[in-house]
Amino acid sequence: MRIVIQRVLAGEVIVSGKLVSKIDNGLVVFVGIEKGDTEKDVFEVSRKISNIRIFENEAQRMTFKLPDNGEILLIPQFTLLGSLKGTLRPDFTEAEEPERAKELFNLLLKVLKEDYSRIVRDGVFGEHMLVNLQIDGPVTIFYDTRGK
């Protein structure tokens, strides 16, 4: 499972011209489900998202987790599994089949909602989304459960 975490001041998802999700200060997490990913990957990623320390203290050092009023926007993005090895056209053969990927994405969403007293919102799986972000920093962190 691959994720990209971005610290944001605001984020929103629009599908077919309609606003479907919106957050203020917090994290936007793009999620790519890879063939062979399991519930173990879901819990590992949830732990990383819940505990990542990318919010700064007074000395501008990243030492704090998401603040109590922080929000999370979880966005499915199979293109994180795209490979350009030997080609200029992305190859998505490592992306999980849509049905299984949606199942694992929904489990991650559920786990984060249960573990957080904060607001957790999501994009729309399998839909074309317009994602607007106000990235803070910029701070962008990549994580792959397989260490790639």
Kindly give the residue locations of the regions a language model identified.
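Extreme N-terminal starter segment of soluble prokaryotic enzymes
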Residues: M1-R2
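N-terminal intrinsically disordered, cationic/polar leader segments
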Residues: I5-V15, S21, G36
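Short beta-strand segments
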Residues: Q6, G32, P76, N132, ...
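Short glycine-enriched loops at secondary-structure junctions
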Residues: L9, I72, Q77-L80
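Compact, glycine-rich, soluble single-domain proteins
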Residues: L19-N69, G82-K110, D115
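Residue-level signal for inorganic ion chemistry
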Residues: V45, I75, V139
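Glycine/charge-rich, flexible interdomain linkers and switch-proximal surface loops
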Residues: E58-I72, R121-L133
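Positively charged, low-complexity, intrinsically disordered RNA-binding extensions
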Residues: F92-K148
